[in-house]
Design a protein with these regions (language model features):
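Extracellular/luminal low-complexity segments enriched in Ser/Thr/Pro
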Residues: 103-113
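Surface-exposed or secretory-pathway low-complexity segments enriched in glycine-proline
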Residues: 53-101
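Positively charged n-region of N-terminal signal peptides that target proteins for export
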Residues: 1-4
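Bacterial N-terminal signal peptides
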Residues: 7-17
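A short beta-strand micro-motif common to beta-rich folds, especially ectodomain repeats
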Residues: 112-125
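Extracellular interdomain linkers/hinges and stalk-like, low-complexity segments
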Residues: 21-67, 125-139
Length: 139
């Protein structure tokens, strides 16, 4: 039986790295992520990407459970590089490979300055799951 190797790949942003940890189904809430972005600019919150041992993409569903009050979050498909992740470990033989995954992208309302907050979770076809609580400072 093939076992999925998974990684959560982050975009360029300020703040501590995302530690993917489940906070639903009775698991503890992960530490919040703190990011900063210019008003109206796109900010990649994460790049959930999962693959099998042959480096083929494994599906992943992303659900925004608490949308931001002053912006939008979109989930778009995109190529992501298989890199190590603190939770899921080494990418194995797929390290450095471009694999089709998703990107979770935040954009504030035009002209908004202040704080925003979003919660989302993802689940792969293989049952890997994580949740993120993101505090966003918009300047």
């Amino acid at each position: 039986m093939k076992r999925a190797i998974a990684a959560l790949l982050l975009g360029v942003a300020t703040g501590p790295p995302l530690v993917a940890d489940t906070a639903f189904a009775g698991h503890p809430v992960p530490d919040p992520i703190w990011l900063t972005v210019d008003s109206g600019a796109d900010l990649t919150l994460s790049r959930p990407t999962f693959w099998d041992r042959a480096c083929h993409p494994v599906g992943v569903a992303v659900t925004v459970t608490q949308p931001p009050a002053h912006g939008t979050v979109s989930v778009v498909a995109g190529l992501n590089t298989a890199n190590p992740n603190p939770r899921f470990g080494s990418p194995g033989p797929c390290g450095g490979t471009l694999i089709m995954g998703k990107r979770v992208v935040y954009r504030s309302e035009p002209g908004f300055n202040g704080n925003d907050y979003v919660v989302y979770h993802y689940v792969s076809d293989r049952g890997n799951r994580a949740e993120a609580h993101v505090n966003i400072t918009v300047r």
